[in-house]
From Swiss-Prot:
Belongs to the class-I aminoacyl-tRNA synthetase family. This is Leucine--tRNA ligase. The lineage of its organism: Bacteria, Pseudomonadati, Pseudomonadota, Betaproteobacteria, Burkholderiales. GO terms for cellular component: cytosol. It comes from Burkholderia lata (strain ATCC 17760 / DSM 23089 / LMG 22485 / NCIMB 9086 / R18194 / 383). A motif ('KMSKS' region) lies at residues 624-628. Keywords: Aminoacyl-tRNA synthetase, ATP-binding, Cytoplasm, Ligase, Nucleotide-binding, Protein biosynthesis. HAMAP family: Leu_tRNA_synth_B.
Amino acid sequence: MHERYVPADVEAAAQGDWRAADAYKTQEDSQKPKFYCVSMLPYPSGKLHMGHVRNYTINDVMYRYLRMNGYNTLMPMGWDAFGMPAENAAMANGVPPAKWTYDNIDYMKGQMQSMGLAIDWSREIATCKPDYYKWNQWLFLKMLEKGIAYKKTGTVNWDPVDQTVLANEQVIDGRGWRSGALVEKREIPMYYLRITQYADELLNDLDGLGWPERVKIMQQNWIGKSFGVNFGFPYELDGEKKLLRVFTTRADTIMGVTFCAIAAEHPLATRLAQDKPELLTFIDECKRGGVAEADVATMEKKGVATGFSVAHPLTGEPVEVWIGNYVLMSYGEGAVMGVPGHDERDFAFAKKYDLPIKQVISAEGQQYSLDAWQEWYGDKETAVCVNSGKYDGLRYAEAVDAVAADLNAGGFGDKQVTWRLRDWGVSRQRYWGTPIPIIHCPSCGDVPVPEQDLPVVLPEDLVPDGSGNPLAKSEAFLNCACPKCGAAAKRETDTMDTFVDSSWYFSRYTAPDAETMVDARTDYWMPMDQYIGGIEHAILHLLYSRFWTKVMRDLGLVKFGEPAKNLLTQGMVLNETFYREDASGKKTWYNPLDVTVTHDDKGRPVGATLNTDGQPVVLGGIEKMSKSKNNGVDPQLLIDQYGADTARLFTMFAAPPEQQLEWSGAGVEGASRFLRRVWSFGAANREALAARAGFDAAALGEADKALRREIYSVLKQADFDYQRLQYNTVVSAAMKMLNAIDGAKGATPGVLRETYGVLLRVLYPVVPHVTFELWKALGYADEFGPLLDAPWPKVDEAALEQAEIELVLQVNGKVRGALKVAKDASREAIEAAAVADDAFAKFSDGKPAKKIVVVPGRLVNIVV
């Protein structure tokens, strides 16, 4: 072995051995417990970032530790390869999205391999490959058969210049991101999946998951089970009697209704605008701008009076109808009751348009005022009805029951459970995605593609130009024959939401070569024992994947109903930011590698200059690594300079996996220095370590016993920390071990070999290359087999036994020293040793002991 640690040589050698042995190819094995651990598959954006490195290293550490403990472990990898960024890159570079995507996959796969990850590459998938998305199409057709998939009109963002549909994130301040045109809302036919059919199960099954409470709460809120009342305001129009339906969780405030607001797309709005140009103008304005709920929540609330009134269902009084830009047709009934006295949004709206405000609840000790909104106005916990006729004096629950009963008696409505969750619209008017397997025939209508004709293959040679969907212009793709009648027909040009692709990939990993969507191997591996990914996926991806899994179960494809037993949301990687600001307020951000920072005597940054010109830059603070702040660190540069093991060690040591990690160049150097110490000790002591000298534990001297006691004591803690995923303290334990071994004076070769072997196995899951090579070079592999499958070291409990123990010595309750006594010393012997100790003589002021308190194994307190 080399005297000096050369990471590039060490890592190349280890990876060569792993490739030759096909070390990470995994098969099902009923004789072992299985552990299936998955990192959320990456989007092939071009390069890995440090967040990827952290995520995959956590997964890899888990894999290696459990494999050493006898588990049949699996760590696969794939690519979430469809999506809008590929189309954007294609437009920018004039190349098909497919080429951009596959080139990125090749580069990023090479980066992963250089990290030494224990990935079974025989299971690799890319969601843009026909052999994968065929099953998206197949399951979509099954859902269509079962009524889970259906078609209806939906509202989208339409760019009138580019003639294309925009995603919510492509609408910036109401304008298209490319054209700058004012965005319109359009109603177009789209396919939806009935996720609401599973709402109760999605909510209730959260209780059985080992997921972070924060994620569970986010999903609960998104599903949004609400108990309220659905009712209607009666009206007559064009000779017909109808109800303007609304849903409310605050039926106790119904007597405070002073207006109703409806969405611009509501049928009543359309009818009322027929002969009122001012209403048409406002409706057109509402149709410009994003359709995202978040956009609606933050934009200025506007409205226009229709001049039409409905009747209050309980009093018969007229209630004016307004069209409001904050009411979404896609949520609830597309209409809301306005109670400005007790709803903050309605209060602001009423103040803006000078609408009546009526107080109908009060709270003890509070004074109601129309001047400004107060939080208690909307508090149902302290609410008591007032100015509400027969409901006066009732509290929230009583009032809701009474109002619901009266509405029901009048035929206007009743109690109802509703959900914030909406059916999943999966149609996307984009090119780079899974084609929806539908054919449009002039005679037969919408016809599903026959199963034997799947997959409908997406052409990979098209280059989008931003003006509509390229599929609609591709005659080769578009034109086909109707499967029913044989007439000329057109293919559906919409593609599926890319969340479809990521909703079941972890099941396909288990049977990547199956001629069916999944097979028996899937039930062996699934559900995932551990899923790892960022908190940003807490709602959409994780909720959709849970729904998709339940659909697969109900179709008889799998036996499980949840995709992942446990979830780890790793913390973000942070780094310093630096910038300069010009006269217009525009900031230019500089990478930390291009900046020199000065620190005060406590190590805090106090100033910085740009290396190229020596002029000052502003310290922007520590933020998440991102392209926008230019504060990322290229993992490849780190690996090239220090090696993959150093990158892995730093990311595991710097913080617990679930917490944020602050980047530190000094920390990276420290990790590298530690690995050099591990290697140097092995090289300097290779003769003793490779000698395979045995020893009689009972005959060992005190130095050997002390070293073994320390190593096995630390091993016990490290094992516990591995089990609870606290890898930062595992690394701390390894550092303690090295210090103990390196500092042991007079340790015999046999004990040195034993304890260093424990250190290598403890470190191996975190830094597999250097430990694998040391294990082999020092002869451990000849004795125990390659480190890949070496058994996890067992704690030698006998080594932890001590002839003497140390007790804290107190005089009058204050610590005054330490007392060494025989482990099995009697109480009398301990008391005698305590009063004979120099510390007692020094701190008792010559007074005799009145009382001696002995806490076995811990302390002695002498009271004088």
